From Swiss-Prot:
Belongs to the flavin monoamine oxidase family. It comes from the Eukaryota. Residues 139-152 have a biased composition (Basic and acidic residues). This is Lysine-specific histone demethylase 1A. One of its GO terms (cellular component) is protein-containing complex. Residues 1-177 are annotated as: Disordered.
Length: 853
């Protein structure tokens, strides 16, 4: 299957490498396609030159990394990232730099963050790196350094390597920290702020500094107490002089932050009552986290909001199993760091019982034996190098298309693995060539020595005969004796030299035979452990590696949040339940059709318990938070009239929607190590690598939660619960012993792909897709004018959900932020922007077209 692609991959890699003339080192993103110097391949792996000499295989797989924690509606939520964001909305042009590499995450060292070191070698760097300390520092500097070291106290004793490091990274505090926590740069305006405050961005620098202080201080006041509404009056009262002198600017900043969900979001006590008269009617399809967040915002802005939910509960893919003392999340499960995460605010508003996830994750082989630490670390290091190599192929050699088809991460990894296997065979061949060459040299030498020995023997006989002539000998006879002696001495010396060379060759031959190179790149055992890491990466992305985009699969890595990953021990569903309080939600109501025109919208829905019962809802705007899996469904689950534009449907088709399933096992007692949150099970085959590969111990009650990822996630949905639970117990008995593992009291098996209201777990960047598609998914749709020549209509159909937020996809916080984003967009459209100057018009809405990326 891969043979046809091998030669092409090898040739492409060789050509690029020959042109680049690279050195060994770690590659940094952005090289070949940007016209900058090409970085070298990752150390320890066969470089592009080797690629040219042999077959290339398919590619295999970065987060994350990862694994991702539970997604907003999936089963695991990928690590988000901290970083400045241009307001809560990322525009179509805000592509993130590509990074690929590996790092440990708080969720466990098994999680790939898939980041490459951001290092670019320059000539100066290389020359400095090669200097010794004596060459680098002057004599005065060396003496001063020595004196300073004498005065320094001895370093504190380091903790044993086995111990968990509980320390958290330092984060900025004060107004600067408030901006950081809100994902904003503290010292400059974002592009969204610049668009909303043109008078400030075009004004003097001092005016911008005043704006930034007011903005950051307002954020700080909100974050200090997010349980109570932060009013304009309270903000003005607490602002220090002279920043409180410009009340108009303070009001504009407060209105902007409130409108865009940076303050007064989530569940908080209102100081000002909701307006009695509602302005504008909005129907929200779906009551997941994005829909609930948007609904609360729109309601607080004074709009009339109704949510239509097909399930008999709120939360969507945030689903918690509860029975007696047993609590376990079937969907979203992990908070991926609190530094910059809006869930940090929600966790203060809601009773979220957060607990850090310990990083230690022992692995157990198929026979139940623990994987030795040295073997575990060696394979994990190789896994990291393989990912770095695929990044090098993509970003430095631009090997992203093969036979006019986008290359997947899975293909790339197999390419690198096969190149490594070829490299091992090449080394074997070279080794045997050296042995054969040494043997030939030894054979030739021994033949010389045999011939020389015969000559010496013959010459010795001649010398003996010449010496036996009794004196007095004539001059001729004397000369003959001396010449024979001289020749004999020379031959003996030559023989001794050959004997010395013989010893060296025999020693070399012995060394070569005693130290053969490895005959395989990966033993079958190594490959099984490597497949465990691949399964973990498939968990992070909720899809087989063969479907992931090689170039863009980790495009959101720059926005990862800081801090430990945490679990919600009392169940993640406490969040949507709290968000739903006080909202108009129609449960068991499935939307069948959405009609949108220049004058308004109409939503047709049915009762899921009695499909003959139809409801029609008229409104000014519709916010669609349907999961991407439902939007991809064929035939369509929801009909749009008129049909969605081609640029929207193409984005839906290009993007990937993954699958990840869980098995919840509730026991009457703990039989595993209670100090460990994670332990892995290494499958026996590549095909089954994702089957029950990771067990989680997170809750107070004795519960184990097993994950099924990759190809196994889809296969498992067609197998009965009894068989799946039986397989789980067999694995656990192999690890802990048959007598130690009791029958579970309760079991639950998720099947997210079969769920008609989800059709999968969460989005991923499929081969052929990119971060641009998330931006396209977020774009609202404007109906065409009903009458030719009529004014350009306004947008009527809006979209939110984890699949619409480029920087934070496949996460609960991403869903939350997308809901806040769309609430601000809808309110600006129908209520006007309160933060604009009186002389400014509300920003116009562009005509409907394919958004330029």
């Amino acid at each position: 299957m891969l043979s046809g692609k091998k030669a092409a991959a090898a040739a492409a890699a060789a050509a690029a490498a020959a042109a680049a003339g690279t050195e060994a080192g770690s590659g940094a993103a952005g090289g070949a396609e940007n016209g900058s110097e090409v970085a070298a391949p990752p150390a320890g792996l066969t470089g592009p030159t080797d690629m040219a000499t042999g077959a290339a295989g398919e590619r295999t797989p970065r987060k994350k990394e990862p694994p991702r924690a539970s997604p907003p509606g999936g089963l695991a939520e990928p690590p988000g990232s901290a970083g400045p964001q241009a307001g809560p909305t990322a525009g179509p042009g805000s592509a993130t730099p590509m990074e690929t590499g590996i790092a440990e995450t708080p969720e466990g060292r098994r999680t790939s963050r898939r980041k490459r070191a951001k290092v670019e070698y320059r000539e100066m760097d290389e020359s400095l790196a090669n200097l010794s300390e004596d060459e680098y520092y002057s004599e005065e500097e060396r003496n001063a350094k020595a004196e300073k070291e004498k005065k320094l106290p001895p370093p504190p004793p380091q903790a044993p390597p086995e111990e968990e490091n509980e320390s958290e990274p330092e984060e900025p505090s004060g107004v600067e920290g408030a901006a950081f926590q809100s994902r904003l740069p503290h010292d400059r305006m974002t592009s969204q702020e610049a668009a909303c405050f043109p008078d400030i961005i075009s004004g003097p620098q001092q005016t911008q500094k005043v704006f930034l202080f007011i903005r950051n201080r307002t954020l700080q006041l909100w974050l200090d107490n997010p349980k109570i509404q932060l009013t304009f009056e309270a903000t003005l009262q607490q602002l220090e002089a002279p920043y409180n002198s410009d009340t108009v600017l303070v009001h504009r900043v407060h209105s902007y932050l409130e409108r865009h969900g940076l303050i007064n979001f989530g569940i908080y006590k209102r100081i000002k009552p909701l307006p009695i008269k509602k302005t504008g009617k909005v129907i929200i399809i779906g009551s997941g986290v994005s829909g609930l967040a948007a609904a609360r915002q729109l309601q607080s802005f004074g709009m009339d909001v109704t949510l239509l939910e097909a399930r008999d509960r709120v939360g969507g893919r945030v689903a918690t199993f509860r029975k007696g003392n047993y609590v376990a999340d079937l969907g979203a499960m992990v908070v991926t760091g609190l530094g910059g995460n809006p869930m940090a605010v929600v966790s203060k508003q809601v009773n979220m019982e957060l607990a850090k996830i310990k990083q230690k994750c022992p692995l157990y082989e198929a026979n139940g034996q623990a994987v030795p630490k040295e073997k575990d670390e060696m394979v994990e290091q190789e896994f990291n190098r393989l990912l770095e190599a695929t990044s090098y192929l993509s970003h430095q050699l631009d090997f992203n298309v093969l036979n006019n088809k986008p290359v997947s991460l899975g293909q790339a990894l197999e390419v690198v693995i096969q190149l490594q296997e070829k490299h091992v065979k090449d080394e074997q061949i070279e080794h045997w060539k050296k042995i054969v060459k040494t043997q030939e040299e030894l054979k030739e030498l021994l033949n010389k020595m045999v011939n020389l020995k015969e000559k010496i023997k013959e010459l010795h006989q001649q010398y003996k005969e010449a010496s036996e002539v009794k004196p007095p000998r004539d001059i001729t006879a004397e000369f003959l004796v001396k010449s024979k002696h001289r020749d004999l001495t020379a031959l003996c010396k030559e023989y001794d030299e050959l004997a010395e060379t013989q010893g060296k060759l025999e020693e070399k031959l012995q060394e070569l035979e005693a130290n053969p190179p490895s005959d395989v790149y990966l033993s079958s055992r190594d490959r099984q452990i490597l497949d465990w890491h691949f399964a973990n990466l498939e968990f992070a992305n909720a899809t087989p590696l063969s479907t992931l985009s090689l170039k863009h699969w980790d495009q959101d890595d720059d926005f990862e949040f800081t801090g430990s990953h945490l679990t919600v021990r009392n169940g993640y569903s406490c969040v949507p339940v709290a968000l739903a309080e006080g909202l108009d939600i129609k449960l068991n109501t499935a939307v069948r059709q959405v009609r949108y025109t220049a004058s308004g919208c109409e939503v047709i829905a049915v009762n899921t318990r009695s499909t003959s019962q139809t409801f029609i809802y008229k409104c000014d705007a519709v916010l669609c938070t349907l999961p991407l899996g439902v939007l991809k469904q064929q035939p369509p689950a929801v009909q749009f009239v008129p049909p969605l534009p081609e640029w929207k449907t193409s984005a839906v088709q290009r993007m990937g929607f993954g699958n990840l399933n869980k098995v919840v096992l509730c026991f009457d007692r703990v039989f595993w190590d209670p100090s460990v949150n994670l332990f892995g099970h290494v499958g026996s085959t590549t095909a089954s690598r994702g089957e029950l590969f990771l067990f989680w111990n997170l809750y107070k009650a004795p519960i184990l939660l097993a994950l099924v990822a990759g190809e196994a996630a889809g296969i498992m949905e067609n197998i009965s619960d009894d068989v799946i639970v039986g397989r789980c117990l067999a694995i656990l008995k192999g690890i802990f012993g048959s007598s130690a593992v009791p029958q579970p009291k309760e079991t639950v098996v998720s099947r997210w792909r079969a769920d008609p209201w989800a059709r999968g777990s969460y989005s991923y960047v499929a081969a052929g897709s990119s971060g641009n598609d998330y931006d396209l998914m977020a774009q609202p749709i404007t109906p065409g004018p009903s009458i030719p020549g009529a004014p350009q209509p306004i947008p009527r159909l809006f979209f939110a959900g984890e699949h619409t937020i480029r920087n934070y996809p496949a996460t609960v916080h991403g869903a939350l932020l997308s809901g806040l984003r769309e609430a601000g967009r809808i309110a600006d459209q129908f209520l006007g922007a309160m933060y604009t100057l009186p002389r400014q018009a509300t920003p116009g809405v562009p005509a409907q077209q394919s958004p330029s990326m």
